[in-house]
C-alpha cells in the first residue's frame, strides 16, 4: 500500500520516496523496509506495522530525553525533571517533534483513517514518531537517537525550560472556564483497551454538558491533559 501523498510530492525520488524525510531527520536508513514499517499504521492491515517498534521507541525516548534533561537542568530536583519530561514524553510532545520533520506526510494509513484525517491525530503521529526513533536506534544506536532528539528539541521549542515547556493544561482550562462559564470541566472515560503493559485510554471533556474534545493517551492523565489542550485551543479560536 503506497502513500499517495508521498508519491505525489515534488521532493520524492523514484528510488527513495523518503529522501526529504531522511534529510529532515538527519539520518538515512540502510534498511528502507524498517523505515516503511515504522511509518505503517495498524489500520493498513499489513503483515508488518509499527506497533512493536512503537513499544521499543517509547523506552528509548524515555531514556534519551530523561538523560538530556538530567544534564541540561542540573538545578532541577526530581519533581521538576519529572514534570519537564512528562511534557515532552507524551502524545502532544512527540506530535510536536514529529511535525518538525513533517512526519505526517509520510505515514501509511488506511483509506478510512485518511478520510478522518488520521495522519494528523496525535495518537497516530506520536506513535509513528516513537517507532521511527526505534528504527534509528536499531540501526545506529543510542548516540544517534540522542543527537536527533537534541536537534529536534532545538527546532520545535523556542525555549526549553519548565516555565515555557510544561503547562498544566487542565489547570489552565479550569481557570478559564470558571471565569468564562462559572463551571469547571468534567472528564469521562470513553474507552480503555490494550494489555496491561500497553494500555490506551480515550477520554472526553465536557463543559456545561457539551463535549469539547476527545483524546487518547497511555494514561488517563495524559489523555485528560490532551483533551484540555484541545479545548483551550477551541475556546481561544471562538474569541
From Swiss-Prot:
It catalyses: Endonucleolytic cleavage to 5'-phosphomonoester. Mg(2+) binds at residues 54, 127, 130. CDD domains: DSRM_RNAse_III_family, RIBOc. Its cofactor is Mg(2+). It is found in: Cytoplasm. SUPFAM superfamilies: dsRNA-binding domain-like, RNase III domain-like. Pfam families: dsrm, Ribonucleas_3_3. Its main location: cytoplasm. Its EC number is 3.1.26.3. Residues 168-237 form the DRBM domain. One of its GO terms (molecular function) is metal ion binding. Residues 18-141 form the RNase III domain. The active site is at 58, 130. GO terms for biological process: mRNA processing; regulation of gene expression; rRNA processing; tRNA processing. One of its GO terms (cellular component) is cytoplasm. It is an enzyme of class 3 (hydrolase). Keywords: Cytoplasm, Endonuclease, Hydrolase, Magnesium, Metal-binding, mRNA processing, Nuclease, RNA-binding, rRNA processing, rRNA-binding, tRNA processing. Homodimer. HAMAP family: RNase_III (MF_00104). NCBIfam families: RNaseIII. Belongs to the ribonuclease III family. Digests double-stranded RNA. Involved in the processing of primary rRNA transcript to yield the immediate precursors to the large and small rRNAs (23S and 16S). Processes some mRNAs, and tRNAs when they are encoded in the rRNA operon. Processes pre-crRNA and tracrRNA of type II CRISPR loci if present in the organism. PANTHER family: RIBONUCLEASE 3, RIBONUCLEASE III. This is Ribonuclease 3. It comes from Helicobacter pylori (strain G27). The gene is rnc.
